[in-house]
């Protein structure tokens, strides 16, 4: 399998997210990079599923809650930006205040 750097990065984010969702299911609280990876993967997969930028911007705010992450993490993440592939091309999706 031959992947370019962007494809490798997307695959790494997806794999990290799958591992981290298992940790979350076991009740472990997520740290900063773990929370960012899960929300980023949610955005990228949502785009592949045909969701719009507006939908992902809103739904991205409900992927994780304060109870899912370590203390202080919500305050560290003002917004998350992810480049996602939509049916009509690649777009930048920004989720403001993603952890409520």
Swiss-Prot record:
GO-annotated molecular function: nickel cation binding; urease activity
UniProt pathway: Nitrogen metabolism; urea degradation; CO(2) and NH(3) from urea (urease route): step 1/1
Catalytic activity entry: urea + 2 H2O + H(+) = hydrogencarbonate + 2 NH4(+)
Main localisation: cytoplasm
Family as reported in the entry's similarity comment: Belongs to the urease gamma subunit family.
Subunit organization: Heterotrimer of UreA (gamma), UreB (beta) and UreC (alpha) subunits. Three heterotrimers associate to form the active enzyme.
Protein name per Swiss-Prot or TrEMBL: Urease subunit gamma
Species per Swiss-Prot/TrEMBL record: Sporosarcina pasteurii
């Amino acid at each position: 399998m031959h992947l370019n750097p962007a494809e490798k990065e997307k695959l790494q984010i997806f794999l990290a997210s799958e591992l981290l969702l298992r940790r979350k299911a076991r009740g472990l609280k997520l740290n900063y990079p773990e929370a960012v990876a899960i929300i980023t993967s949610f955005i990228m997969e949502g785009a592949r599923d045909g969701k719009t930028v507006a939908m992902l911007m809103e739904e991205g705010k409900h992927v994780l809650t304060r109870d899912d992450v370590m203390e202080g993490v919500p305050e560290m993440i003002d917004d998350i930006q992810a480049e996602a592939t939509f049916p009509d091309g690649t777009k930048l999706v920004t989720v403001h205040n993603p952890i409520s």
